[in-house]
């Protein structure tokens, strides 16, 4: 795209989210700004991908048993050795988010293996070299050394705002003149969760929608 100008009009942030209003000035080649705004909005809310845990399997073994056999448990299991209710532990894993350093696959696997008692954090998860966790948070606490937990995680790339970190996208259209050049302005209001900045989302939108823009 040529003759594209992006300005920050407004920025706001808190502990859990970011909001930025961008002023995007385009040359007159792109006459249908309503369609352009829709392309951006639909991509950010529906097609922009994010990495999430698709499947998780928890295996436990009692270290004081004669044979160290692991058996499968679910979110409704009662484990006295874990301080938190196991259903809450299950939910914490669901909320973990990952980021690719470079794209290799649509599916990845990660593992968490506990040794001894104490607090277990997301930084203890072993992930592929091209993935990183977006935050370190407490997962659960083992109150004894008698239980070993082995967690296998399947991580998938999924489309849509529940997974990619985009919370809200709105846009306003405006026409203006500057000298002999007619500019069309698109104001794009993007709100994202703490692990994704609106600027990152916008740049990814420009990169992925280039084919759609070239046909306008």
Swiss-Prot record:
The keyword Transcription applies. GO terms for cellular component: chloroplast; DNA-directed RNA polymerase complex; mitochondrion. GO terms for molecular function: DNA-directed RNA polymerase activity; protein dimerization activity. One of its GO terms (biological process) is DNA-templated transcription. It is found in: Plastid, Chloroplast. Keywords: Chloroplast, DNA-directed RNA polymerase, Nucleotidyltransferase, Plastid, Transcription, Transferase. Its main location: plastid. It catalyses: RNA(n) + a ribonucleoside 5'-triphosphate = RNA(n+1) + diphosphate. InterPro entries: RBP11-like, RNApol_insert_sf. The keyword Transcription applies. Its EC number is 2.7.7.6. DNA-dependent RNA polymerase catalyzes the transcription of DNA into RNA using the four ribonucleoside triphosphates as substrates. In plastids the minimal PEP RNA polymerase catalytic core is composed of four subunits: alpha, beta, beta', and beta''. When a (nuclear-encoded) sigma factor is associated with the core the holoenzyme is formed, which can initiate transcription. Belongs to the RNA polymerase alpha chain family. This is DNA-directed RNA polymerase subunit alpha.
């Amino acid at each position: 795209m040529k003759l594209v100008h992006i300005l920050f009009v407004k920025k706001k942030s808190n502990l859990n989210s970011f909001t930025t209003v961008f002023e995007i000035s385009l040359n007159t080649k792109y006459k249908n700004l309503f369609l352009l705004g829709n392309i951006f909005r639909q991509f950010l809310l529906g097609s922009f991908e994010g990495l999430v845990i698709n499947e998780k399997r928890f295996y436990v073994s009692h270290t004081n048993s004669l044979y160290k056999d692991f058996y499968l448990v679910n979110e409704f299991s009662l484990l006295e050795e874990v301080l938190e209710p196991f259903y809450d532990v299950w939910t914490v894993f669901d909320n973990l988010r990952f980021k690719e350093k470079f794209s290799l696959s649509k599916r990845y696997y990660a593992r968490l293996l506990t040794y001894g008692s104490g607090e277990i954090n997301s930084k203890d998860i072993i992930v592929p070299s091209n993935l990183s966790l977006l935050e370190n948070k407490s997962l659960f606490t083992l109150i004894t050394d008698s239980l070993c937990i082995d967690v296998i995680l399947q991580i998938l790339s999924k489309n849509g705002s529940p997974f990619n970190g985009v919370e809200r996208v709105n846009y306003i259209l405006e026409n203006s003149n500057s000298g002999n050049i007619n500019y069309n302005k698109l104001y794009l209001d993007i709100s994202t969760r703490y692990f994704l900045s609106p600027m990152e989302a916008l740049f990814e939108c420009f990169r992925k929608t280039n084919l759609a823009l070239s046909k306008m």
